[in-house]
């Protein structure tokens, strides 16, 4: 079965400082709040550090090829505090990169990129991951900013 190496990237400006966003993103347990398809996270003792391995439990309904609440593993690849973090999702064979760029004191541009090999018929879903993740992150950040 033929696969293609594909990279999908989306950016969004959020009403929060880079420090506030980093504080939220650096907490492993928050990943399930904004990353699509993750119901819970069990980080190892290292937390957000290169080489750390987090156990993930997916949410959602079962499909022909996926059980409900399937497990996955995340491996943290690189951490540059306040700037970027990258990780690998083993089950999906996805490399994920999240980058933060301060626009001013209270606004930050967040870029989410995913790369991996997918069969052509599956390209729609992986390409949409950055957009869905940013939409969920935006909803969380904007709600917190308005409190």
Residues covered by each model-derived region:
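Hydrophobic-ligand-binding modules of eukaryotic lipid transfer/binding families
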Residues: 1-13, 103, 107, 131, ...
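Short, surface-exposed charged micro-motifs
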Residues: 11, 75, 97-99
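A short, structured loop/turn motif at beta-sheet edges
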Residues: 18-19, 46-49, 77-82, 99-109
């Amino acid at each position: 079965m033929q696969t293609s190496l594909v990279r999908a990237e989306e950016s969004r400006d959020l009403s929060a400082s880079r420090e506030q966003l980093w504080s939220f993103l650096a907490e492993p347990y928050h990943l399930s709040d904004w990353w699509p398809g993750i119901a819970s996270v069990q980080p190892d003792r290292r937390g957000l550090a290169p080489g750390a391995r987090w156990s993930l439990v997916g949410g959602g309904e079962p499909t022909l090829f996926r059980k409900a609440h399937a497990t996955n593993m995340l491996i943290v690849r690189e951490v540059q505090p306040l700037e970027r973090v990258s990780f690998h999702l083993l089950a999906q064979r996805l490399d994920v990169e999240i980058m933060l760029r301060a626009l001013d004191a209270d606004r930050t541009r967040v870029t989410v990129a995913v790369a991996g090999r997918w069969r052509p018929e599956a390209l729609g879903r992986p390409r949409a991951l950055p957009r869905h993740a940013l939409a969920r992150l935006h909803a969380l950040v904007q709600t917190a900013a308005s409190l």
